[in-house]
């Protein structure tokens, strides 16, 4: 009952999901053809198929490719390009980790590109302040050279990418940002 409702919903969906229907039916046919008589072996065989569908895309191509003799692999590659977010979850390599103890390491480009105030705010230049200056007006170039604050999400991300060494208070002689390190008139 539930399988027929699911199949009807898949058929009613747009053309993007039609190759998935072909993939599921051909995989089911091949599994039924190669089904073993022992029930414990059958559950192991089908459990392997279920885990491979949930796994990432490269392993999915290799495991289903053994079952389907080439046709399913081409369909899967076609679907993987159309729906990348279903097969590959988004991953951002934000931090570096040391090989010995697994501690987080600082991403050096963050230290070079951004300035962290002691209050936790991050300063950056506007995007594109070095690019294609020949076609930008003088006023626009001046606006792009200005420093702006990073948003809350960006600040949290940058804090993850740096260690506590870069979050300590520094007392530089003649620091132009000395008066901005502490937030005043801030009600918490």
UniProtKB/Swiss-Prot annotation:
Its main location: mitochondrion. GO terms for cellular component: mitochondrial inner membrane; mitochondrial large ribosomal subunit; mitochondrion. GO terms for biological process: mitochondrial translation. Pfam families: Ribosomal_L35p. GO terms for molecular function: structural constituent of ribosome. Gene3D superfamilies: 4.10.410.60. Keywords: Mitochondrion, Ribonucleoprotein, Ribosomal protein, Transit peptide. It is found in: Mitochondrion. Belongs to the bacterial ribosomal protein bL35 family. This is Large ribosomal subunit protein bL35m. It comes from Mus musculus (Mouse).
């Amino acid at each position: 009952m539930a399988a027929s409702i699911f199949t009807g919903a898949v058929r009613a969906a747009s053309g993007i999901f039609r190759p998935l229907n072909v993939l599921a039916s051909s995989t089911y046919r091949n599994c039924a053809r190669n089904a073993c008589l022992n029930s414990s072996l059958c559950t192991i065989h089908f459990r392997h198929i279920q885990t491979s569908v949930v796994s990432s895309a490269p392993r999915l191509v290799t495991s289903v490719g053994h079952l389907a003799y080439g046709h399913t692999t081409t369909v899967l590659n076609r679907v993987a390009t159309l729906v990348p977010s279903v097969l590959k979850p988004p991953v951002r390599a934000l931090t570096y980790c040391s090989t010995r103890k697994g501690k987080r390491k600082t991403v050096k480009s963050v230290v070079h590109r951004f300035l962290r105030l002691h209050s936790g705010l991050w300063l950056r230049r506007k995007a594109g302040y070095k690019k294609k200056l020949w076609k930008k007006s003088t006023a626009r170039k001046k606006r792009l050279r200005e420093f702006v604050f990073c948003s809350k999400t960006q600040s949290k991300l940058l804090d993850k990418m740096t260690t506590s060494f870069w979050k300590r208070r520094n007392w530089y002689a003649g620091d132009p940002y000395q008066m901005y390190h502490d937030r005043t008139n801030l009600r918490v």
